Amino acid sequence: MNPITLDEKTILGAISLEKIGELIKPLRIFYKDKDFYTPDLLNGHAEIPAGVRITFETNSPIMMVEFASSQNEVEFDVVIDHERIKTVIVQPGDTSFTIDGLSNNHKKVEIYLSQQQQVLLKNVFVDENAKWEVHKSTRKKWLTYGSSITQCHAAESPSQTWPAITANELDLDLICLGYSGQCQYEPMVARTIRDTPVDFISLSAGINIYGGDCYNHRTFQAIIIGFIKIIREKQPRVPIVLSSPIYGTFREDTPNLVGLTLIKMREQVKEIVEIFRKNGDESIFYVNGLDILSAEHENLLPDGLHPDADGYKLMGRKFAAAFKPYFKKDNVFSY
């Protein structure tokens, strides 16, 4: 069969790629600085390829994907010309899967990697008589940062996370920095966003900080302001949307160990945007998380915090509508 070159041109949505022998590990941090992303690559979540997809064009009727075996089930989505045609569930120990019966027409192929498990890629093959080429995207790039609610462990499949749905609806190329339990607004992540040229940025603020009792009334706004200031060092005019937490059941009015509630955090997140705009930053905007999922959607939060698969689909549609006024495609920003 005919191998596809796996590199930064065909593996999209990763921040960097780590070569391990004959394997490639997509990372959602800069590999060269990996020791600085403490603890242990954001507790391992930077190694999980949420939003990462192998992307190319081909006329092949068959494809084979090879990877390192896992101790767990691993899901992949196969998307042809922006339509999901199959979710492949790979069993523990398996090292490949094949998709056949495709048309001989020229098509865009996207193979979404798992948003739940680490994936080490080995090869992708098309038919030996088929042609393939790098997909030259004209889409704008969008980077989103958040928690497990952005990583979307409970999504129906890898291409059904809310960021993937939003990106598809708005015709954007996605970079997803959703790190389960790790959205603490540390400077290394701010530097990562600063040093990744994109057209649009969205930041979700609050729920991991509430759950981790990380910052109090004195430090909550200060850490997020500093985070955005770092991004602005190299991306001064790129639109940034800062969103506050979605509905969080008892967390709404129950203070955490440092005295914050989600109600108070939303007020402070909104105020952060007002501070930036008052000081001349007209490219930063606020989205209230309750406009995405509110108390009326509590049935979509089975554990009172994380959305289920239907909840993530709704979030994808709602965020697309919320971001659309700010992510204007005719805007061109220099990095």
Residue ranges: model-predicted function:
Residues 302-335:
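Histidine-centered active-site loop/cap adjacent to the catalytic His
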Residues 166, 185-225, 230, 245-252:
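Oxyanion-hole/transition-state-stabilizing segment in secreted/luminal serine hydrolases
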Residues 250-287, 314, 333:
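Substrate-gating cap/lid alpha-helix
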Residues 65, 145-146, 243:
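Short hydrophobic segments within beta-strands
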Residues 215-223, 257-265, 303, 307:
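Alpha-helix N-cap and loop-to-helix initiation/capping positions
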Residues 235-240:
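A short helix->loop->beta-strand "cap" motif at the edges of active sites that frequently abuts
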